[in-house]
Amino acid sequence: MEEARIATSHDSIPHVKPVSFVFAEDSIIIATDYDTRTFSNIKLNSKAGIVIDIYKSGEHKAVCIQGETKIIEEGKEFKKWYDIFYKKFTWVRKDPWTEKEAPFLKIIPKNKVSWGLT
């Protein structure tokens, strides 16, 4: 399963949730909705953390990333990420959206740590 967990916050209160993601151009891209806690937190505080991991007993592999988040709502970059998500995820094909209906969040890594990866 390709899922990660994103952490955002405001007023020093953390919020963590599972998300689908794409890793491209040295960034992590996720889709969200305007009415989510994640989006409202990012509007107030652009810093985010994300964990991507695979867990098998004795073979845990993970990367933890902290970075700055850019909101992508329209234009060529929106279209590029939407096309990638559309091809990759069934849930996007079942419930499509257009520009300004739901944004993408682009997490640009500033710090990272990993284990179990070569």
Go through the PLM ranges and name each one:
Residues 1-2, 45, 88, 110:
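Structured helix-beta-strand junction loops
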Residues 1-34, 42, 50-53, 64:
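Short beta-strand segments
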Residues 4, 28, 48-50, 69-70, ...:
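Short beta-strand segments in beta-sandwich/barrel cores
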Residues 12-13, 56-58, 98-99:
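A short beta-turn/loop motif at secondary-structure boundaries
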Residues 20, 40, 94-97:
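Short secondary-structure boundary/capping segments
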Residues 34-35, 47-52, 83-93:
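Short acidic (Asp/Glu) patches
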Residues 36-38, 57:
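Short, surface-exposed beta-strand-loop junctions and turns on beta-sheet-rich folds
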Residues 61-118:
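Charged, gly/pro-rich active-site loop segments
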